[in-house]
């Protein structure tokens, strides 16, 4: 029993240390407090987190255009939950601009991270959107 609890705690800890969870948190903080400077504490994923956060923020207009052009009938960004929108934007940034990471890895990592922030039905919706979009953005992956 104790071994099982220890394993479960470590499993949760390792999931919680996912760099994509940190990306989502940083983007949410930026959305809620746009004037605040974004802090990137030292970690093995610091460069990755900084690249994705800055890239998502800098290219948010382009990402929004991508969503509108590929998913106009599937999603209304004005009515989309803020956290879902943040996760979607970060994942699309990676799909469009981080070609060194396979699309399946990007999607599965954001779906895992989304479990901390979204309801199960929203995670399913996110999965469908990312799957559809990834097929259009990365045909050769």
What do the predicted segments below correspond to?
Residues 1-116, 122, 127-141:
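N-terminal interaction/assembly modules
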């Amino acid at each position: 029993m104790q071994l099982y609890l220890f394993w479960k705690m470590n499993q949760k800890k390792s999931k919680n240390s996912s760099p994509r969870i940190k990306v989502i948190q940083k983007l949410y903080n930026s959305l809620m407090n746009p004037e605040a400077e974004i802090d990137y504490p030292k970690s093995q994923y610091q460069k990755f987190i900084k690249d994705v956060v800055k890239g998502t923020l800098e290219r948010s207009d382009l990402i929004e255009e991508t969503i509108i052009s590929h998913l106009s009938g599937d999603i209304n960004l004005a009515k989309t939950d803020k956290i879902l929108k943040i996760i979607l934007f970060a994942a699309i940034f990676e799909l469009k601009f981080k070609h060194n990471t396979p699309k399946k890895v990007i999607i599965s990592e954001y779906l895992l991270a989304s479990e901390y922030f979204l309801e199960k039905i929203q995670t399913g919706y996110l999965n469908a959107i990312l799957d559809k979009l990834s097929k259009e953005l990365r045909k050769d992956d």
